[in-house]
Design a protein with these regions (language model features):
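Short beta-strand segments
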Residues: 182-184
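Hydrophobic, aromatic-enriched interface-forming segments
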Residues: 118-122
Length: 195
């Protein structure tokens, strides 16, 4: 039997047990997509892996998925203004992912960024982010529904279309120029990285 590629899925550091225990988790929809759509074997990457262990980890992987997450990248990584005190942060993930990205690029290892993951790739190469896009009059509100009783179907339903660039692998793979996607973001790319 032929072995399948192994793809690392970054986790988020979350707080449980009324603030008494930190855990590492990734949304089931990310893991399911990697297993079922991409037909690879997922393994979860802890958000706190030591930098000197990254080489050992990446030697075992064929690619990395940078998931979305509740927390946003801290602004000191891209020269942005400090977040309000109530903003959820994940400093261990910030450090881990910002170390993983250049290692993957150096190895020519595929990286797939989703939501926060796209922002992390941009920041890793010198790009900047604008915070709370919904407060900008000329930008669409991409946040998830704000009502507590919203169903998962409502939260994750497609909200807007994206247009693929001429040489996009997605355009080739899907055989279409546009695609409907969901959007749950507070952030958007302000200045895209040069690389």
């Amino acid at each position: 039997m032929e072995s399948k590629p192994i793809v690392g899925v970054i986790t988020n550091e979350t707080v449980g047990f009324n603030g008494r225990q930190l855990s590492h988790s990734a949304g089931k929809r990310y893991v399911d997509a990697v297993m079922n759509f991409a037909d690879v074997v997922p393994i979860l990457i802890p958000a706190c892996i030591r930098k000197n262990d990254l080489g050992t980890l990446l030697d075992m992987l064929d690619g990395v998925v940078l998931t979305g997450g509740r927390a946003n990248i801290e602004p000191h990584h891209y020269g942005g203004q400090a977040f309000p005190n109530d903003e959820v942060i994940d400093p261990d993930r910030d450090k881990t992912v910002l170390d993983i990205i250049p290692e993957c690029i150096q190895r020519h290892m595929p990286i797939f960024g989703i939501c926060r993951g796209i922002q992390e790739i941009n920041v890793a190469y010198g790009g900047t982010i604008f915070y709370r896009v919904h407060q900008q009059g000329d930008k669409e509100d991409h946040r998830m529904p704000q009502n507590d009783d919203a169903s998962l179907e409502e939260i994750f339903k497609p909200r807007h279309q994206i247009t693929f660039t001429e040489y996009s692998l997605f355009k080739e793979f899907l055989g279409q120029d546009r695609f409907w996607v969901n959007s749950l973001c507070l952030l958007y790319t302000s200045d895209a990285a040069d690389e």
